[in-house]
Amino acid sequence: MELPTHLAGLKQNFKGEITTEEADIEHYSRDASIFQIAPQAITFPKDIADVQSLVKFVSEQKTDQPGISLTPRGGGTDMTGGSINDSIIIDMTKYLNVISNLTDGNVTTEPGVMFRDLEVKLLARNKIMPAYPVSKAWV
């Protein structure tokens, strides 16, 4: 499925993947809530520059397309519809899932890291994350 004309500029300066395939639209139109909202496109940024490119694109389009928006998504486990929208979804889990800088008191994660993966690394050092995210699946 082709990108809608008004979203064609998304491909510019974007190294990641963009999909508008019907099966993907169906999958990303739901989360753990009772709601269903079909997005126009789903993006999979490869790095922070891709995320910046998406934000810049949407910001530049706001005048002509006031309804355009970005919704970041992890596991889609939100129970309030917070990970679905009718515009552009940014799936952080495919490429932005690195755990780094694991020291005695700190850890740095990218937004797509699953909690279970972080927990394994922390427990190997006899550490825990004292507060769980709302969804234990994602950090």
PLM regions: where:
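N-terminal accessory segments
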Residues: 1-32, 57-70, 75
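N-terminal glycine-rich flavin-associated loop
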Residues: 10, 34-66, 92-134
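Short, acidic (Asp/Glu-rich) active-site segment that either coordinates a divalent metal cofactor
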Residues: 78-80, 89-92
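Flexible loop/turn segments at secondary-structure boundaries
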Residues: 27, 78-80, 115-117, 138-139
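Short acidic, glycine/serine/threonine-rich loops at helix termini
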Residues: 80-86, 119-121
